[in-house]
């Protein structure tokens, strides 16, 4: 009987999901993306060679693994095709193994224009989006006016819908944001080119997943971004536009929650965030700079510097509950090597002096102060360790304390960027 495993982020994204998905796909028949778009950036390092993926599931680098994009993913055809070509130049037969749901909403040029115009208009109050049209595409979906990949294969119907959409969005772009209009004919011609290239990749992903389930195959679901960026459960409004939590699997792929066997939560040994929004443990001192430099904390998608801070057990406890986490993978432990002391946030103190749990919206974080528990650091290197016994005693104590504070076992520890630099204590597919 097969196992169905989920890998998702438990913080604000950039936790190191790509490496772990790649590691675990050795046991998987298929890897599935179920939400987000090309705002994700999953970095894989195999034998020292770095590959960054945005839309295509991380299983693409494992020979024979099928890669599926479910209906919950918003797809920018130009970005997808660029990614396919780049991988094919490395000798990876992407088109043989990649299949996409025709129900995926399309991201087109007017979505990008709207996204960037809004961020520009917000000025210092911008959300911090990637400017890639993700939010506007999801808005069109929810408003029931969006175009899907399947619409591309019906030219007349597609052209009529596109005309209506451009009338609507161009009115806003030109009259409200004072930006240039998007050209109808140019957009239509581009889309018809996409149609010819994408048609061979179409598949009823939901039906395929259930066929695999009945056949006893092992399936992995790959989350993008992190739980604290979830549109419903994140630090609203500084969130993404999709459900990044485990609930997004059912809606984004058609695979019901009762079929899931194990949910692996990826969490850094410290905390990072890209863009705007609350971040209680953020550091503005030498330690923050140390973490950023040692951890190479720059976004794989945008190149933006990530904000860095101490590990936050409060937000992780919330993420564990929301996602029904079975076990954790602690990544970038080696980045903490050399610190004399390490702080863990165990609570938030409000202006009245009361210690409270994680708020559910951004404004409620105002005035909160992190309550820290201090632990000894270690001077020895943890880089590349493959067993728990190889780690310094202080590092093992840190891991144990994190488990105690968050109420979940740490089943995997990542000690470096390469897939081999990993300690596996309990295998999700085991």
UniProtKB/Swiss-Prot annotation:
Its EC number is 6.3.4.4. One of its GO terms (cellular component) is cytoplasm. Pfam families: Adenylsucc_synt. Substrate binds at residues 300-306. Binds 1 Mg(2+) ion per subunit. GO terms for molecular function: adenylosuccinate synthase activity; GTP binding; magnesium ion binding. GTP binds at residues 13-19, 41-43, 306, 332-334, 414-416. IMP binds at residues 14-17, 39-42, 130, 144, 225, 240, 304. It is found in: Cytoplasm. Its cofactor is Mg(2+). The active site is at 14 (proton acceptor), 42 (proton donor). GO terms for biological process: 'de novo' AMP biosynthetic process; IMP metabolic process. The keyword Nuclease does not apply. Pathway: Purine metabolism; AMP biosynthesis via de novo pathway; AMP from IMP: step 1/2. Keywords: Cytoplasm, GTP-binding, Ligase, Magnesium, Metal-binding, Nucleotide-binding, Purine biosynthesis. Mg(2+) binds at residues 14, 41. It catalyses: IMP + L-aspartate + GTP = N(6)-(1,2-dicarboxyethyl)-AMP + GDP + phosphate + 2 H(+). Plays an important role in the de novo pathway of purine nucleotide biosynthesis. Catalyzes the first committed step in the biosynthesis of AMP from IMP. Homodimer. NCBIfam families: PRK01117.1 (NF002223), purA (TIGR00184). Belongs to the adenylosuccinate synthetase family. PANTHER family: ADENYLOSUCCINATE SYNTHETASE (PTHR11846:SF0). This is Adenylosuccinate synthetase. It comes from Pseudomonas savastanoi pv. phaseolicola (strain 1448A / Race 6). The gene is purA.
């Amino acid at each position: 009987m097969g196992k169905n495993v989920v890998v998702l982020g438990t913080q604000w994204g950039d936790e190191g999901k790509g490496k772990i998905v790649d590691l675990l796909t050795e046991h998987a028949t298929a890897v599935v993306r179920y939400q987000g778009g090309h705002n994700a950036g999953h970095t894989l390092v195999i034998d020292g060679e770095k590959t960054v993926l945005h839309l295509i599931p991380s299983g693409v680098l494992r020979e024979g693994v099928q890669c599926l994009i479910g209906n919950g993913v918003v797809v920018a055809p130009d970005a997808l095709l660029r990614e396919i070509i780049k991988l094919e130049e490395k000798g990876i037969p992407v088109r043989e193994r990649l299949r996409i749901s025709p129900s995926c909403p399309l991201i087109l040029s007017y979505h990008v224009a709207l996204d960037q115009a809004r961020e520009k208009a917000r000025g210092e109050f911008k959300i911090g989006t990637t400017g890639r049209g993700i939010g506007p595409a999801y808005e069109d979906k929810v408003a029931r006016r969006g175009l899907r990949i399947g619409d591309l294969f019906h030219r007349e119907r597609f052209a009529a819908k596109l005309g209506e959409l451009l009338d609507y969005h161009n009115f806003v772009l030109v009259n409200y944001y004072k930006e240039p209009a998007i050209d109808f004919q140019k957009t239509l011609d581009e889309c018809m080119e996409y149609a010819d290239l994408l048609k061979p990749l179409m598949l009823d992903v939901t039906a395929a997943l259930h066929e695999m389930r009945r056949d006893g195959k092992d399936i992995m679901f790959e989350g993008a971004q992190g739980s604290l960026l979830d549109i419903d459960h994140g630090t609203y409004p500084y969130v993404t536009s999709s459900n990044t939590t485990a609930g997004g699997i059912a809606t984004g792929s058609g695979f019901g929650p009762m079929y899931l066997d194990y949910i692996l939560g990826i969490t850094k040994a410290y905390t990072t965030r890209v863009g705007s929004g609350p971040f209680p443990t953020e550091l503005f001192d030498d330690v923050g700079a140390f973490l950023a430099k040692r951890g190479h904390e720059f976004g794989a998608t945008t190149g933006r510097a990530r904000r860095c801070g101490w590990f936050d057990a409060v937000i992780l406890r919330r993420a564990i509950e929301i996602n029904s986490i079975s076990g954790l993978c602690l990544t970038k432990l080696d980045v903490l090597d050399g610190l004399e002391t390490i702080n863990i946030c165990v609570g938030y103190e409000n202006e009245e002096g009361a210690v409270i749990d994680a708020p559910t919206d951004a404004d409620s974080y105002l005035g909160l102060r992190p309550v820290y528990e201090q632990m000894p650091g270690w001077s020895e290197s943890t880089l590349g360790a493959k067993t728990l016994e190889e780690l310094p005693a202080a590092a093992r104590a840190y891991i144990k304390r994190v488990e105690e504070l968050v109420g979940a076992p740490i089943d995997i520890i990542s000690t470096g960027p390469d897939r081999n630099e990993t300690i596996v204590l309990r295998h999700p597919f085991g």
